[in-house]
């Protein structure tokens, strides 16, 4: 089993990462932008959306359609929650022949227990992402399709991709350079529209550029805290905050917990004691992205 504390991307194939968490936390409005298979190794995961709750126990998995938003609870077992995820590239999904009887996944497909062969296929797919030198791309893609076959066996298939909303396109832009100031003129130019059109389109989607930039930074901060061992101060710098204390204040404002709570570590205790005030959040903040 791969246990690297980092995010690994293989273009055209997929993304993998492993999450460790030591206390139970409720994280609200977490967006899963891409089709993802989440596997719980230890503890319990709860996904809540639209009045429903999906429970994934240890040894189980959830196949999540892209573009979904959940409230997430990761519940440790004896002090440890461990999970990992596999994001499958859209091109791989597009090339997979879905059996006629299989329906598109609506939000999330719960798989309470993974058969040994399914788990082996999943591990082989993760290994293909982690070690491109050892696994040719054609083989890596085939391993991904085997995982899709197992998901289909459980009655679901990832729906075909749809054109992304403006907000999602902006999140992708911001993620490419989290420290950039991202002014409206530059964003509008990159999206080939006027500033007025940009503001109007974002208003129609119930968000703003300021909210999206902040949310994207917080999303990546959450991911880095969950899947790497980098210090909180380093994470703050990576997502565009020169001041660790201001970062900690913004993080607490968004998630209701200080950064150190994600790992139940004390490294940010001094930061938490010196947090700077930040402006009040919008009433309905844009969703933060993937948290396994």
PLM region descriptions:
Residues 204-243, 263-292:
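Terminal helix-turn-helix DNA-binding modules in bacterial transcription factors
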Residues 100-154, 158:
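Amphipathic alpha-helical segments enriched in hydrophobic/aromatic residues interleaved with Lys/Arg
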Residues 1-6:
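Cyclic nucleotide-binding regulatory module and flanking cytosolic helices
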Residues 43, 59, 198, 221, ...:
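Short hydrophobic/aromatic patches on the structural cores and recognition surfaces of FHA
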Residues 7-105:
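N-terminal regulatory/effector-sensing and dimerization cores
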Residues 125-135, 148-159, 171-183, 201-202, ...:
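Basic, amphipathic alpha-helical hairpins
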Residues 114-123, 140, 160-182, 189-191, ...:
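A short, Lys/Arg-enriched amphipathic alpha-helix from helix-turn-helix/homeodomain DNA-binding modules
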Residues 184-213, 230, 236-261:
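Basic/polar phosphate-binding segments, predominantly the helix-turn-helix DNA-binding elements
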């Amino acid at each position: 089993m791969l246990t690297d504390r980092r995010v690994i991307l293989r273009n055209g194939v997929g993304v993998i990462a492993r999450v460790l968490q030591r206390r139970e936390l409720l994280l609200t409005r977490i967006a899963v932008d891409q089709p993802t298979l989440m596997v719980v190794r230890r503890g319990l995961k709860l996904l809540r959306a639209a009045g429903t709750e999906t429970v994934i126990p240890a040894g189980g998995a959830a196949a999540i359609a892209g573009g979904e938003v959940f409230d997430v609870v990761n519940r440790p077992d004896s002090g440890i929650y461990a999970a990992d995820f596999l994001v499958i590239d859209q091109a791989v999904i597009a090339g997979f022949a879905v059996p006629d009887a299989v329906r598109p996944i609506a939000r999330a497909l719960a798989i309470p227990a993974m058969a040994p062969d399914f788990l082996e296929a999943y591990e082989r797919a993760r290994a293909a992402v982690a070690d491109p030198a050892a696994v040719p791309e054609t083989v890596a893609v085939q391993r991904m399709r085997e995982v899709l076959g197992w998901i289909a066996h459980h009655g679901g298939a990832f729906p075909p991709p749809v054109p992304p909303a403006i907000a999602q396109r902006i999140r992708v832009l911001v993620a490419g350079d989290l420290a950039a100031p991202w002014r409206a003129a530059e964003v509008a130019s990159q999206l080939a529209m006027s500033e007025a059109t940009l503001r109007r389109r974002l208003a129609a989607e119930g968000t703003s550029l300021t909210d999206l930039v902040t949310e994207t930074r917080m999303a990546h901060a959450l991911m880095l805290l969950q899947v790497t061992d980098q210090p909180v101060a380093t994470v703050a710098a990576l997502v565009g905050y020169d001041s660790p204390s201001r970062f900690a204040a913004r993080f607490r404002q968004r998630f209701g917990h200080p950064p150190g709570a994600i790992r139940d570590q004390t490294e940010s205790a001094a930061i938490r004691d010196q947090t700077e005030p930040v402006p009040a959040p919008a009433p309905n903040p844009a969703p933060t992205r993937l948290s396994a």
